């Protein structure tokens, strides 16, 4: 059993990062997992240190977007091929010329493309599930979510079993400052409706989502949390933002607020003189996306469709947020010792623009997602890894 797992679990979230050379704690992971008393919780066990993992403790940023399709980035020659895109289904509100879609997609991700140029792009990376909750559970546990009874978003919102070891617990046990910013979606939750006169078409506006205490991020390995517990949140005026256990007001556009929080984490780790592990989970470009982004993002796009412009602007807001974070890392002298793993929770949604859509359709685009790893090893730029990877054991 262990031999078979070793061959397939190269693809777990932790092993993917290990392959990037980061796990200073790898030799101790199996002992940590035993504390959970679950015999099947083997995703973090049986790893040994490498020459890179024993050199020190690099900072780690695990950065996710929400419903970003593989085709949103030019991962291979077919990503932005007009002939490939001609017969793709697109709902009327997002129908724009293929050339305009390609141009907008390219303009929306310059920073992410630079990370890809600097690191490794995984052209055959698959998520563990086609929807958010189970997929994120795989990120945190390194295990197929079916192993612990999570088959849907509804299951995830009943809470990931407390017997499961979460990735940040291992970092925390080995001296890391750990922080989660953005979307959580792994707690047992309760929803309290907001007054009817404040409800909107965006269902995320219509209730405040609370997490049960045991499933709070601070009880799953994170020293600090700022974000939301549900499947999504409004881009403006969210009623469901929390800093640790206290509700906090929304401040402007949600992507900017999450970026500001992430920069605060980076600065705090420097002040504490600790290595850090940051899980930064943006909600963009999750729908509905009816409201335009701030002008510095929105003005970049003029596809002929307001909804398509809103979509691309939300992606660009994250891209520029990542740029700000990278600049802060460089300013603080942390950049050269920071590993960045970028991905999406699942593929693009049906109700979205080209280049790629397909989440919840059972198509390949629901399961294959962008993976980029910017790490400390001396690897050639534009290196592509075509071996199949998945965030959960099979």
Task: List PLM regions with ranges.
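Gram-negative bacterial Sec-dependent N-terminal signal peptides
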Residues: 1-28
């Amino acid at each position: 059993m262990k031999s078979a797992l070793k061959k397939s679990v190269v693809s777990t979230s932790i092993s993917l990062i290990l392959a990037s050379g980061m796990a200073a704690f790898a030799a101790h992971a199996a002992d940590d997992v035993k504390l959970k008393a679950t015999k099947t919780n083997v995703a973090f066990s049986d790893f040994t240190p490498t020459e890179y993992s024993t050199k020190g403790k690099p900072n780690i940023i695990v950065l996710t977007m929400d419903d970003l399709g593989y085709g949103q980035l030019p991962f291979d020659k077919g990503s932005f091929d007009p002939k490939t895109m001609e017969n793709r289904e697109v709902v009327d509100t997002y129908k724009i010329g293929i050339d305009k879609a390609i141009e907008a997609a390219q303009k929306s991700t310059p920073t992410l493309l630079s990370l890809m140029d600097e690191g490794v792009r995984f052209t055959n990376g698959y998520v563990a599930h086609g929807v958010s909750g189970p997929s994120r559970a795989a990120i945190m546990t390194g295990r197929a979510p079916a192993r612990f009874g999570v088959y849907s978003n509804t299951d995830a919102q009943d809470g990931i079993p407390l017997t499961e070891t979460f990735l940040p617990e291992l970092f925390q046990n080995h001296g890391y400052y750990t922080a989660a910013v953005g979307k959580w979606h792994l707690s047992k939750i309760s929803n309290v409706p907001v007054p009817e006169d404040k409800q909107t078409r965006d269902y995320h506006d219509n209730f405040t989502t609370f997490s049960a205490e045991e499933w709070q991020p601070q009880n799953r390995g994170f020293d600090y949390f700022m974000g939301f517990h549900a499947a999504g949140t409004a881009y403006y005026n969210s009623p469901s933002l929390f800093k640790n256990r206290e509700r906090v007001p929304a401040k402007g556009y949600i992507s900017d607020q999450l970026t500001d929080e992430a920069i605060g984490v980076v600065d705090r780790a420097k002040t504490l003189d600790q290595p850090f592990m940051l899980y930064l989970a943006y909600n963009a470009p999750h729908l509905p996306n009816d409201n335009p982004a701030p002008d510095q993002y929105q003005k970049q796009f003029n596809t002929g469709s307001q909804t398509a412009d809103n979509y691309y602007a939300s992606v660009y807001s994250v891209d520029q947020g990542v740029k700000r974070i990278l600049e802060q890392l460089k300013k603080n002298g942390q950049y050269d010792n920071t590993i960045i793993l970028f991905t999406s929770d699942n593929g693009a949604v049906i109700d979205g623009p080209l280049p790629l859509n397909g989440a919840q359709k059972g198509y390949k685009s629901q399961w294959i997602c962008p993976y980029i790893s910017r790490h400390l090893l001396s690897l050639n730029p534009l290196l592509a890894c075509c071996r199949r990877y998945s965030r959960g054991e099979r």
